[in-house]
Amino acid sequence: VYMSGSRVNCNVPNDALADYDIVYVVKDTKPFYEDSHYMERFGEILYMQEPDRLDASVGKKLDFNEKYTWLVIYTDGNRIDLTVCNEKKADITGDRVYRVLLDKDGRFANAPVSDDRARWVKKPSEAEYAAVCNEFWWCINNVVKGIKRYEITYAQDMMNYYVRPMLLKMLSWKVGILTDFSVSVGKSGKYMNKWLLDDDYEMLLETYSGGLAGEMYHALKVMADLFDKIGLFVGDKLGYEYNERDSKAARIYMDMVRKMKL
């Protein structure tokens, strides 16, 4: 039995909302997935999800005899993500952040030392840096067209699923530079405020807009300003050239489309 995730990672905040990610390595998973009442021993269940069963119900091919997972929230507020799996699927080295709770058969005697290095921000190559810059500025055209046409759901998707990830990537590289690439910023950059300047973080928060066209234009402009600022910083520190031509061109197009009569 081992636990992984934030509960065993000393480098991330830990509070009452942190999940318990528990894995039981067993010889036979069938008794567990056929009758899960044993989970009630951990407390009264408020509600739960069985992602493997849901995936199988829509045609995804899964072998419950290899691995099965439950996501459970109890009435006391605790959440347990519990997996039973055979030894073949016990991926203790893949996560690298874990704590062995019980090892009756000595299966984890030679397990590597637990750490979160695999999640640290990685220094980008010059090609990766250039690609992120180009993707950010290019994808802005889809956002501004969506706003202009009042296709708000489309524009929001373009902003949040294509443009924003590039901004967060660039911000994570700044954090990497400030920390000698020795930390993780967490999923969706949720820990970045620990290292970013207050002004930078406040600008980032300003990029999360509502559904009004004016709000979205403003958020997009702030995104562009912040990306320029951080992109120049990262490029300077790593010795990479920042593509100011794309930045200027994208801004020209943004203004052109906003003033356009359809």
Segments predicted by a language model, with ranges:
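Metal-dependent nucleotidyltransferase catalytic core
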Residues: S4-L17, V23-L82
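Conserved nucleotidyltransferase catalytic core and NTase-mimicking acidic/glycine-rich helix/loop elements
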Residues: W120-L262
